[in-house]
Structures are given as C-alpha cells and as structure tokens.
Amino acid sequence: ASVNDLSMVVEVAYRESGVLFTGDLSAEGEPSPLPDVDVLKVPHHGSAQACSDRMLAELTPQVSVIPVGENNYGHPSEQTLERLESAGSEVYRTDECGAVTVRILKDGAIRVKTYLPVEEP
C-alpha cells in the first residue's frame, strides 16, 4: 500500500446530499463500504489508480471534480475519465475550468460554478 492510501477521507452531508473528499487515495486504499454521494472530489488528481469501478458503483456521484494542473504524470488518466463518464458523472477539471464551486441547495439541487469558460462537448 502507498502512503497516499493514508489520506484523510471526509464525507460532508447536507440534508439528503453528500460530498466525498478523498485525498490521494488509490483503489487499494478505498474504504468499504462507501456512502452514496452526489459530489466526488476525485482521488489523486484522477490518476489511473483512482476511482475503481466498485467505488463509482457505490458512490454514484452526479458531479466529479478533479483538482489537477499541468503535470508530468498524465493526470487525469483517460481510464479514470472514461470510468467517470460511464458512471454518468458530470466531470469538472480545474486545469480546464479553473476553480470549481459546488452548492447544494435546500431542495437537493446541485449548482456548479466554474471560474473559466467551459466548452460544451
């Protein structure tokens, strides 16, 4: 196991919604069971070892945020992006859209604000 798997994992719950902050976990370090959350801070900048299929099946995030900048590691990996897309999660990358603010409204609706213009696919 990697020292990254000692990352603090924090779930923030508000009414019926949840957000999971995962630090730099790899698939090996994923806790079990996982909560059903609406928003996921993708582990380890979206590395290839982040977000196993099991994790995404248990979490079912509507929104995933990948904090990543220019790097020599190839983060986020194509495999992780494909897993998030297959899980039906809306993905926001800070290298493409700048800072990301996520608000959960009283009715459970999720509002995402990006600080750079985001091109529609």
Feature map (PLM): residue ranges:
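Active-site-proximal loop/helix segments of hydrolase catalytic cores
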Residues: A1-P76
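Binuclear metal-ion centers of metallo-dependent hydrolases, dominated by the metallo-beta-lactamase
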Residues: A1-N4, N71-P121
